[in-house]
Amino acid sequence: MSLCRCSSICLRRPILRSFNFLNKYIDQSQHSGGLSSFQRLSFSNTGKNESTDDSNQIRCDADKTAADKKKQKQKEEEQAKIREYKRECLKVQKRVLAEEIRCSGEKDRILIQGMMKCLTDGMKKACTKIAKAKLIADKELAVQCAALSKKDKVKALLKKCEREKSKEKECNQNSPAEGDKDRTKKGKTKGKSGGGNKKRSTKENRAKKGKKLVKNRFTQKLEHCIKSEWADVCECRQNFTEDERKRLAASYKCMGTKIKSICRKRVIAEMCEAAGYVKSSEPKKKGKKKKNDEKKEKELEREILKEQAEEEAKIRGVVKEVKKKCKEKALKKKCKDLGRKMKEEAEKKKCAALAKKQKEEDEKKACKELAKKKKEADEKKKCEEAANKEKKAAEKKKCEKAAKERKEAAEKKKCEEAAKKEKEAAERKKCEELAKNIKKAAEKKKCKEAAKKEKEAAERKKCEELAKKIKKAAEKKKCEETAKKGKEVAERKKCEELAKKIKKAEIKKKCKKLAKKEKETAEKKKCEKAAKKRKEAAEKKKCEKAAKKRKEAAEKKKCEKSAKKRKEAAEKKKCEKAAKERKEAAEKKKCEEAAKKEKEVAERKKCEELAKKIKKAAEKKKCKEAAKKEKEAAEREKCGELAKKIKKAAEKKKCKKLAKKEKETAEKKKCEKAAKKRKEAAEKKKCAEAAKKEKEAAEKKKCEEAAKKEKEAAERKKCEELAKKIKKAAEKKKCKKLAKKKKAGEKNKLKKGNKKGKKALKEKKKCRELAKKKAAEKKKCKEAAKKEKEAAEKKKCEKTAKKRKEEAEKKKCEKTAKKRKEAAEKKKCEKAAKKRKEEAEKKKCEKTAKKRKETAEKKKCEKAAKKRKQAAEKKKCEKAAKKRKEAAEKKKCAEAAKKEKELAEKKKCEEAAKKEKEVAERKKCEELAKKIKKAAEKKKCKKLAKKEKKAGEKNKLKKKAGKGKKKCKKLGKKSKRAAEKKKCAEAAKKEKEAATKKKCEERAKKQKEAAEKKQCEERAKKLKEAAEQKQCEERAKKLKEAAEKKQCEERAKKLKEAAEQKQCEERAKKLKEAAEKKQCEERAKKEKEAAEKKQCEERAKKLKEAAEKKQCEERAKKEKEAAEKKRCEEAAKREKEAAEKKKCAEAAKKEKEATEKQKCAEAAKKEKEAAEKKKCAEAAKREKEAAQKKKCADLAKKEQEPAEMKKCEEAAKKEKEAAEKQKCAKAAKKEKEAAEKKKCAEAAKKEQEAAEKKKCAEAAKKEKEAEKKRKCEKAEKAAALKRQCAKLVIRAKEAALRKKCAIIAKKAKMAAEKKECEKLAKKAKEAIEWKKCAKLAKKKREAEKKKCAKLAKKEKEAAEKKKRCKDLAKNKKKGHKKKGRNENRKKRTDC
C-alpha cells in the first residue's frame, strides 16, 4: 500500500465526522421539543454526585466484558480475513497451474498429475504464509492511517481556531463601540436565561432524585472523551514542527472549548441512541470535495490493480518453487524404486546363473568320472600287454646271458691272472697319486688362508686411512661442504658392502658345492617320480582342456541368447520413446507459437502502462537514490575501517612469519646438530660392527679349521682300522695256513723232524716284532695330537687378549670425543640465546615504527577516499537512472527469447545424446572383436613356449637318467615313448588350431565389412545432426553476444570504479613498502656486521680447536701405529712358529701315512697271493684227501685236536687285549673331542646369537617386503583370474555382438525405410495439427476479447453504481433516522 492510498483512506474519517455534525444541527433545528428536553439537563457540576461504589463496579465489569467481546470479534475477523486471503491465493495458484498444464506436454502433465498431493500441500502452506503476511501488513497500515487521521483532525481544529481569531481581530478593529453594546445586551439576556435555567434545573432535580445515574454517566463519558481527544493532540504534537507547536500553544484555549463542544455533542448523541431517540440528518452539498474524491479513488484503483499483479507474480514464483520441490521428491522416489527393481532383477539373474553353473558342474563331474574309468581300463590293458612283452623279452635275454656267461667264465679264468697283476700295479699308482693330491690340497689351503689374511689386513688399513681422512675433511668443511659428507658416507658403505659380498661369496661357494652333491642324489630319485607324474599330469590336462572347451561353448551360447533378447527389448523401447518425444515436441512448438503471439499483444499493452509507471517510478527512485548515497557513504566508511583492520592483520602475519622463520632456523640448527651426532654414532657403530664381523669371521675360520682337522683325523682312524682289520685277517689266514702245514708236517715228522720246528719259531718272532712296532707308532700319534691341541689353545688365548686391548682403546677414544662434543654444544646454545634477545629487541622497535606509519597513512587515505566517493556518487546517480530504464525493457525481450532457445536446445541435445550412445555401442563391439583376436594369439604363443620348455626339460632328465642304473634306463625308454605320443598329439592340436585360426580370420573379415557399412551410415547421420546443431548454435550465439555486450558495458563501468580504488590502495601500499624496505636494509646491514664479527670469532675458535684435535689425533695415531707394529711382529713370530710346527707335524704324518699305505699294499698283495695259493691247494687237497680221509680220519683227529685248541686260545687272548686297548684309546679321544666341540659350540652359539639378532632385523625388513610382494602377487593373481574371467565373458559377448551386429544391420535397413514412411506421415499430421492450432488460437482470441468486453461492462456498471450511491446520499430525506457510525459506513460500502 502506498502513502497516497493511506492518506486518501484516512482523510475520509474527518469528512464523515463533518457530515455527522451537520446532521446533528439539522436535527436540533427541526425538533424543538427534543432540544428543550436536552436543555433541561444541567451541564454544570453544581449538583451533588451521590453515585455509589456498587454502580461503578457494575460499569467496570460491563466495560471489561465489552472489551473481551471486542477482542473476540477482532480475532474472528482476523481469521475470516486469513481465510479469504487463502481462498484468493489458492484461486490464483490453481489458475496458474491450469495454464501450465494446458501449455505443457504429455510427460509434464503425467508428472503434474502424479505430484498433485505434493502440490496441494505445498500450495496450502504457501498461502497460509502469504495470508498471515497480508494481515500483518493491514494492521500496520491501519495504525499508520489512524495516526494520519488524528494529525489531520488536529490540524483542522488548529485552522478553525486561527480563522476565528483572525475574524475576531478584524471585527474588533472595525467596530469597537458596537462590540461593547452587544456585550451589555448579551450579559442581560444571559442573566435572565441563566436564572430560568437554574429554577428549572432545581425543580427537575427535586422531582427526579432517584435518577442520579444519568448525571454521573454523562460526566464520566464527557471526561473520557475529552481525555482521549487531548491524548490524540499530545501524540500528534510529538511529530509537529516548531512552528506548528507554537501555533498550537497560542490556540490552546480555543482548542479546549471546541473539544468540549464536540465531546458534548458526541456524548449526547450516544446517550440518545441508547435511550431510543434517533435523529435524521442530511449532508450539505459539497461539490468541490467530490471531484477530489473521485480522482483519489481512481488512483487507488490503479494502485490496487498494481498490487494484485505483483501478488499474482509472487504466487506464480511460489508455485514454481513448490513444483521444483515436488519434482525433486518424485525423482528421488523414482530413483529408489528403480534401484530396488534393479537389485531384485540382479539377484534373480545371479540365482539363475548359479543354478545353471551347478547343473553344468554336475554334468561335467559325471563326464569326468566316465572318462577316468575308460582311461584306467585302457591303461590297465596297455600295462598288461607291455608286461607280457617284457617277460618274454626277459626270458630270451636270460637264456642268451647264460650262454654268454659260460663262454666268458672260461675266458675270465685265463684273464684273471693277468688282471690281478695289472690291478696290483694300478693300486700302487693310485695310493701314490692320493698322497700327492693330499699334499697339494694342504698347501693350497695354507696359501688361500694366508692370502685372505693379507687381504683383510689391507682392507682394514684402507678403512682406517679413509676414516682418518674423513674426520679431517669433516672438521674443516662442516660449514662449507655438507654435500661431500654424503659422498664419503656412501664410500664407506660401499667398502663395507664389498667386504660383506666377498665373505658371502666365499660362504656361498662352499654351500653350492655341498648343495650340488645333494642335488645330484635328489635328482636321481626325482627322475623316477617325475616320469610317473608327467604321465598323469598329461592325461589330466587333456581331460581338463576338453571340459573347459565344452563349458566355454555352452556359456557362450547362453550369453549370446540373453544378450540378443536384451538388446532387442532396449531397441524397441528406444524407438517408442523417440516417437513419443517427437510428437510431444511438435505439439509444444505449436502451443508455444500461439502463446508467443498472445504474449506479444499483451506485452504491447503492458509497455504502454509501464511507460506511465516509469515516470512515477523515476520520481520515487530519486528519493531512493538519495537514501542509497547515504548508505553507500556509510558503507565506504566501514570499508575504510575494514581496510585498516586488514592492514593491521597483514602486518601481524608478517611478524608471525618472521618469528616462525627464526624458530625454524633455530630448529634446523638443532636438527643439524642432532644429525651430526647420529652420523658420528652411526660411524662408531659401523666400526664396531666391522670389528665384530672380523672377530666372527676369525672364529668361524677357526671352527672350520678345527672341523677339517676332525674330519682328517676321522679319515685317518678309518684307514688305520681298515689296515688293522686287514692285518688281523692276514694273521688269521697265516695261522690257518700254519695249522694246516703243521698237520701236514706232523705227518711228515718222521721225515723232516727238527727243520719244521725252527721255521715256526722264526715266524713267531716276526709276529712279535710287528706288534711292538705298531704300539710305538700309536704312542707317537698320541703325542703329536697332544702338541697340536696345545698350540691351538695358545693361539686362542693370544687372540682373545688382543681383542680385549683393542676394545679398551676404542672406549677411551669414544669418551674423549663425547667430552669435546658436549663442550661445543654448550657454546652453541649460549650463542643462540644471545641472538634471540637481540631479535626480540629489534621486533619491539619495528612495531612502534609501524604503528606511527599506519596512523599517518590512514589519515591520507581517508581524505582521498572522501573526495572520490563524492565524485563517484554523482556519476553513479546519472548512469543508474539511464540503465534502469533500458534494462527493464531489454530484460523482458531477452527472457522471452531465452525460453524459446532453451526448449529448442534441450530437444536437440536429447536427440544428439541418443545417437552418441548408439555410436559408442558399435565401437565397443569392434574393440571387443580386436581384443579377442589378440588374446587368442597370445594364448597360442604361450602354449607353444610351454611345450618347448617341457620338451627341453625332458631331454635333460633323459640324459641324466641314462647315466644311472638300469632302472633309470627302463624309465627313460617309457618316458621317450610317452614323449613321442605327446608330440603326435601336440602336432594334431596345432593342425586343429591352425584350422580354427583360419575360420576366425574369415569371420573377423566379415564383421569388419559389416562394421564399416554401419560406420558409413552413422557418419552420414552425424553430419546432418552437426549441420542442424550449428544453425542452432549460431542463433544462440547472436543472442548471447547481444546479452554479453550489455553485461560487458556494465562490467566496464564497475571495473573502472574498482580500478580507481585499487590505484589508491596500491599507492598507499607502495609508500609503506618503500618505508619498510629502508628499515629492513638498515637492519640487515647491522645484522650482517654483527654476524660477520661472530663468524670471525667462531672461526678463530674452530681453528684453535681443530689444531688441538689434530695434535691429539696425531699422537693417538702414533701410539696406535706403534702398538699395531708390536702386535704384528708378535703375531708374525707366532705364526712362523706355528707354521714350522705344522710343517713338522704334517711331514711326520705324511711319513706315517706312506709307511702305513705301503704296509697295507704289501698286506693286500700277500692276502691275494695267499688266496690264490689256497684255491690251488684246496683243489689238490680235496682230490687227495678224498682218498686218505677214510683211512687216516680217526688217527689225525686224536693227534690234531689238543695242539689246535692251544693255538686258538692264544690267538683269542691276543685279539681281546688288542680290542680293549683300542677301546680305551677311542674313549680318550672321544672325551677330548667332546671337550673341544663344547668350546667351539659355545663360541659358535655366541656368534650365532649376534648373527641372529642382525638376521632378525634384516628378516623383519625382508618379511615386510615379502608381505608387500605377496600382496602384490595375490593382487596380480586375482587380477589375472579376473582377466581370464573377463576374457571368457568378452568372448561370449563378442560372439553375441557379432550376431547382433548382423541383426542390427538388417534392422537399420528396415528402420531407414520406416523413417521415410514416418516422415511422410509426420508431414500429413503436422498439416492437420497446424489447422487445429490455428482454430484454437482464434477461439482463444475471441474468448479473451469477450472477457475484456465483460470487464469493461463491469467497470462501467461499478462507476454507475457509485454515482447512484452518491446521488442517493445527496437526495436523502430529513425524516430518515441514523443508527450510528457503523451503520453509515456499511451503507456506503454496500453502495
Curated annotation (Swiss-Prot):
Sequence repeats lie at residues 332-347, 348-363, 364-379, 380-395, 396-411, 412-427, 428-443, 444-459, 460-475, 476-491, 492-507, 508-523, 524-539, 540-555, 556-571, 572-587, 588-603, 604-619, 620-635, 636-651, 652-667, 668-683, 684-699, 700-715, 716-731, 732-747, 748-763, 764-779, 780-795, 796-811, 812-827, 828-843, 844-859, 860-875, 876-891, 892-907, 908-923, 924-939, 940-955, 956-971, 972-987, 988-1003, 1004-1019, 1020-1035, 1036-1051, 1052-1067, 1068-1083, 1084-1099, 1100-1115, 1116-1131, 1132-1147, 1148-1163, 1164-1179, 1180-1195, 1196-1211, 1212-1227, 1228-1243, 1244-1259, 1260-1275. Signal peptide: none annotated. Testis. Primary spermatocytes and early spermatids. GO terms for biological process: sperm axoneme assembly. Residues 332-1275 are annotated as: 59 X 16 AA approximate tandem repeats of [KR]-K-X-C-X-X-X-A-K-X-X-K-X-X-X-E. Keywords: Cytoplasm, Repeat. Residues 291-300, 517-577, 766-881, 977-1013, 1353-1370 have a biased composition (Basic and acidic residues). One of its GO terms (cellular component) is cytoplasm. The keyword Cytoplasm applies. Residues 170-213, 280-300, 370-429, 516-577, 729-881, 900-922, 934-1013, 1076-1095, 1104-1212, 1353-1391 are annotated as: Disordered. Its main location: cytoplasm. The keyword Cytoplasm applies. Residues 184-201, 729-765, 934-949, 956-976, 1371-1391 have a biased composition (Basic residues). Disulfide bonds: none annotated. It is found in: Cytoplasm. It comes from the Eukaryota. Possible structural role in the sperm tail. The predominant structure is alpha-helical. This is Axoneme-associated protein mst101(2). The gene is mst101(2).
